[in-house]
Amino acid sequence: MTSSILILGQNPGNNPKAYHYKNHTIDRLNKWADLFDVKHYSFINCSDVRGEIKLKDVDFNYVQSTVIGYNKVIALGGFSSAVLSRINIMHFRLPHPSPRNRALNDKAELSRILDECKRYIHE
């Protein structure tokens, strides 16, 4: 069975020139998708607000209505996971793929999490 996958990020980064340069976060996310044998996925952010956001900046109705039709939902980081939990959406929480995320320095733990996510996608 082919899964329809939605990945939920937090919000756009602050750099207005990000679209013109290499985006290490998206590059890492795409490498992970390759590891999961995922060729296509949809992506949305919790909010379009740049910079630091809070739960009040999230359009929960938009997130909830967008999730409909997807059978696998993946949250990037704790904020996105909290948003999905608040609206009772089952999901898998991945660490945020930003190069600034120090949790990714533990290669053994990251490998375990990525293997677990692959199993979630293909179950």
Regions found by a protein language model. Give the residues of each.
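Charged phosphate-binding loop/patch that engages nucleotide di/tri-phosphates or the phosphate backbone
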Residues: 109-123
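A polyanion-binding, active-site-adjacent surface
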Residues: 1-87, 91-102, 108
